[in-house]
Amino acid sequence: MAEPGLEDSQPVDLSKHPSGIVPTLQNIVSTVNLDCKLDLKAIALQARNAEYNPKRFAAVIMRIREPKTTALIFASGKMVCTGAKSEQQSKLAARKYARIIQKLGFPAKFKDFKIQNIVGSCDVKFPIRLEGLAYSHGAFSSYEPELFPGLIYRMKQPKIVLLIFVSGKIVLTGAKVREETYTAFENIYPVLAEFRKVQQ
């Protein structure tokens, strides 16, 4: 998932991350307005890294290798960029796509760039009693193991959705800024510790 050794080399700031665990950002979804109408067919024909199948989806799908991302480019000039591992990378990628569109002869601008969703993950390294957690936090939890193996926890403050797995692996989604991801994890950590599964 993340490059090994990157997170481990810096000591964790315990004032910000009392649990000692910093969630790794896995995917950033951002949007930007190129502020001009686009001929998707022309883009698909001219750009090397683009596919367009209007019967299936009304956008050009374009990919670049660095930062490794995918963009959805709509005729309205709206663009969605997904796959980056940090906010800066997401913005850099979006700028690269905008530049590609400019080079194809469209007067693309770069308006209203916005991070829409940050997905992070981490591992608390201990198993969790999901039934107990779901029972005591019923207002926030849905846990139906026949449908999905994880517990879905909808935190109100910050407004983050957490997927909590028996293994101790956690996925956090819905953040607009990374601090929300970190805060949500610190909020849930004592709860996870409380419902730690004791190995018999």
UniProtKB/Swiss-Prot annotation:
Subunit structure: Belongs to the TFIID complex together with the TBP-associated factors (TAFs). Binds DNA as monomer.
Localization, UniProt: Nucleus
Sequence repeat intervals: 25-101, 115-192
Function: General transcription factor that functions at the core of the DNA-binding multiprotein factor TFIID. Binding of TFIID to the TATA box is the initial transcriptional step of the pre-initiation complex (PIC), playing a role in the activation of eukaryotic genes transcribed by RNA polymerase II.
Alphabetical UniProt keywords: DNA-binding, Nucleus, Repeat, Transcription
Entry's Gene Ontology BP terms: DNA-templated transcription initiation
InterPro entries with a match to the protein in the record: TBP (IPR000814), TBP_CS (IPR030491), TBP_dom_sf (IPR012295), TBP_eukaryotic (IPR033710)
Effect annotated for changing residue 5 to R: In strain: cv. RTCS 2
GO CC annotation: nucleus
Gene that this polypeptide is encoded by: TBP1
CDD domains the UniProt entry points to: TBP_eukaryotes
Family per similarity comment: Belongs to the TBP family.
Gene Ontology terms, MF aspect: DNA binding; RNA polymerase II general transcription initiation factor activity
Keyword rRNA-binding in annotation: no
Organism encoding this protein: Zea mays
The organism's place on the tree of life at top rank: Eukaryota
Keyword Hydrolase included in the entry's annotation: no
PANTHER family attached to this UniProt entry: TATA-BOX BINDING PROTEIN (PTHR10126)
UniProt-recorded name of the protein: TATA-box-binding protein 1
Pfam families per the UniProt record, alphabetical: TBP (PF00352)
